[in-house]
Amino acid sequence: MTEEHVVYIGKKPVMNYVLAVITQFHEGAKEVSIKARGRAISRAVDVAEIVRNRFLKDDVDVKEIKIGTEELPTADGRTTNTSTIEIVLARKA
């Protein structure tokens, strides 16, 4: 999967990201990866579920879910652990 088929989840409303994922599929992508970390993880799950259950119900399924931890530096020089998630949605055959 190329980097162009990745949607990074941030603080915008959920429907903005849903539209981004749907646009990727309509432009011909076979797979779209939804990535988030920290507090945005729940928003990433919401995006995947809305795309899968409401908009592309019979066309898309969850292919893979990866979870992990990243060490991020803080302002005072220490590191903090932040959870990450990657949800890969794939078009059904």
Curated annotation (Swiss-Prot):
Subcellular locations according to the entry: Cytoplasm; Chromosome
GO cellular component: chromosome; cytoplasm
Pfam families cross-referenced by the UniProt entry: Alba
Transmembrane regions listed in the UniProt entry: none
Superkingdom as given in the UniProt entry: Archaea
N6-acetyllysine: modified positions: 11
Keyword field: Acetylation, Chromosome, Cytoplasm, DNA condensation, DNA-binding
Entry PTM: Acetylated. Acetylation at Lys-11 decreases DNA-binding affinity.
Principal cellular location given in the protein's record: cytoplasm
Molecular-function GO terms, alphabetical: double-stranded DNA binding; RNA binding
InterPro entries for this protein: Alba-like_dom_sf, DNA/RNA-bd_Alba, DNA/RNA-bd_Alba-like
Family stated for the protein in its record: Belongs to the histone-like Alba family.
Function, as annotated: Binds double-stranded DNA tightly but without sequence specificity. Involved in DNA compaction.
Entry-linked NCBIfam families: DNA-binding protein Alba, PRK04015.1
HAMAP family named among the record's database cross-references: AlbA
The protein's name in its UniProt record: DNA/RNA-binding protein Alba
Organism: Pyrococcus abyssi (strain GE5 / Orsay)
Gene: albA
